[in-house]
């Protein structure tokens, strides 16, 4: 049980770092980044739309 919780926390921290890095290091505005959902999450994020509306191999919005 403890291991499962640890993995969950590590994943959460990693996601936070990745999204913060995208928001501040990206060339796009923070607002656009924030409403963009990565393809590997299936495009079903609670914070925004899919980055790739025409499919994962299509152009990024």
Swiss-Prot record:
Residues 21-31 form a propeptide. It holds the Pfam family ATX_III. Disulfide bonds join 36-51, 37-45, 39-56. Residues 1-20 form the signal peptide. Keywords: Disulfide bond, Nematocyst, Neurotoxin, Secreted, Signal, Toxin. GO terms for molecular function: sodium channel inhibitor activity; toxin activity. One of its GO terms (cellular component) is nematocyst. SUPFAM superfamilies: Neurotoxin III (ATX III). InterPro entries: Neurotoxin_3_Anemonia, Neurotoxin_3_sf. It comes from the Eukaryota. The keyword Signal applies. It is found in: Secreted; Nematocyst. Sodium channel inhibitor. 5 uM completely inhibits voltage-gated sodium channel (Nav) inactivation. Belongs to the sea anemone short toxin (type III) family. This is Delta-actitoxin-Avd2c. It comes from Anemonia viridis (Snakelocks anemone). The lineage of its organism: Eukaryota, Metazoa, Cnidaria, Anthozoa, Hexacorallia.
